[in-house]
């Protein structure tokens, strides 16, 4: 089915999941909790009065971190017309797995769910700059994006937390 390969549909799914996260719709956390055992459900459904709960809530820092490759991929696919089927597959997979995290964002230890998409993050950012002909200074741009990503990651790890 050709529409399954179109990134715009995955972006619509991500936007829907973002709105659900913004509105704190708990339906999806309860739905996902039904698929797991009690310990897994405990992460998704928690008592907000419990002070031992990991930092939860609307994580703007995580959303910014996750949105950067979505924005870069959007620019490359729709504005620069990168036609690589492999890149579109990796990009769509990243957007889809990140969408699942958005639905569970208010759960405890949500970064464990986000890691499923974040492992693809460097590939989504760098792959087209190494394997596609985009423009003359693409290697420099790719290196700057990689350094920016590394800098933000180190900032979040050592300064922010």
Predicted regions and their residues:
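Short coil/turn helix-boundary motifs
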Residues: 106, 132-136
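Signature aromatic-anchored transmembrane alpha helix within multi-pass, membrane-resident enzymes
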Residues: 135-155
């Amino acid at each position: 089915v050709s529409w399954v390969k179109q990134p715009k549909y995955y972006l619509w799914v991500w936007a829907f999941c973002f709105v659900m996260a913004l509105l704190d719709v708990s339906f999806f956390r309860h739905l996902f909790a039904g698929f797991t055992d009690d310990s897994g459900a405990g992460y998704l459904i928690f008592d907000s009065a419990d002070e031992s709960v990991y930092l939860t809530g609307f994580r703007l820092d995580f959303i910014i971190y996750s949105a950067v490759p979505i924005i870069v991929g959007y620019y490359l696919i729709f504005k620069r017309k990168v036609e690589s089927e492999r890149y579109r597959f990796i990009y769509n997979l990243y957007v889809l797995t990140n969408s699942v995290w958005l639905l569970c964002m208010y759960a405890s230890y949500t970064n464990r769910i986000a890691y499923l998409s974040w492992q693809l993050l460097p590939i989504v950012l760098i792959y087209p700059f190494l394997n596609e002909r985009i423009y003359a200074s693409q290697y420099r741009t790719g290196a700057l994006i990689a350094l920016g990503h590394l800098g933000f990651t180190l900032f979040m790890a050592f300064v922010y937390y």
